[in-house]
């Protein structure tokens, strides 16, 4: 039973009549809202037309069974809506994943094309250095992987010493503007700095007189 002090839109008592408290039976709860911090339900009254439906505060009602039934129904509808939304999201994910994969393949292809382009556009300098290393290997001399100071355009300052590397003569040469000296095959030094090589030999030669025993 739902208690209500006023009959919805029908109880217009005359100014001199006393208002009597009447009871009306709630047939069905149709909707729910919160107004000014209070819960209200939209009610269908038993024995009255739909046009007589009214919003009533929860505190004025005495139909807890109908309220609980309505709240459970709302909860079930909310769960069903959430489940439907989750299913829709799952169906959309494979498409999104496929798009990402396709993008990845496209990026990989573009990267490979870019890599091929970079290789084809590499300057001829490194190739020239490689051929120089091959020529040096043909002579049996060991040349640093980065080439000698001469390959880097440096100017020799002084020959500091010489050594026999497995039967191959190399010079320890100090280049201008470089702190550390480096070993250079004699075959390279003889071509690049022949006068400096000759002076190096002359400084270390011992001359003997024909009259000495």
Curated annotation (Swiss-Prot):
Gene3D superfamilies: 2.40.50.40. The keyword Transcription applies. InterPro entries: Chromo-like_dom_sf (IPR016197), Chromo/chromo_shadow_dom (IPR000953), Chromo_dom_subgr (IPR017984), Chromo_domain (IPR023780), Chromo_shadow_dom (IPR008251), Chromodomain_CS (IPR023779), Heterochromatin_chromo-domain (IPR051219). PROSITE patterns: CHROMO_1 (PS00598), CHROMO_2 (PS50013). The keyword Metal-binding does not apply. Residues 24-82, 154-212 form the Chromo domain. Keywords: Chromatin regulator, Nucleus, Repeat, Repressor, Transcription, Transcription regulation. It is found in: Nucleus. Residues 89-104 have a biased composition (Basic and acidic residues). One of its GO terms (cellular component) is heterochromatin. Its main location: nucleus. Residues 1-24, 74-151 are annotated as: Disordered. It comes from the Eukaryota. GO terms for biological process: chromatin organization. Pfam families: Chromo, Chromo_shadow. SUPFAM superfamilies: Chromo domain-like (SSF54160). Residues 105-115 have a biased composition (Polar residues). Structural component of heterochromatin, involved in gene repression and the modification of position-effect-variegation. Recognizes and binds histone H3 tails methylated at 'Lys-9', leading to epigenetic repression. PANTHER family: CHROMOBOX PROTEIN. This is Heterochromatin protein 1. It comes from Drosophila virilis.
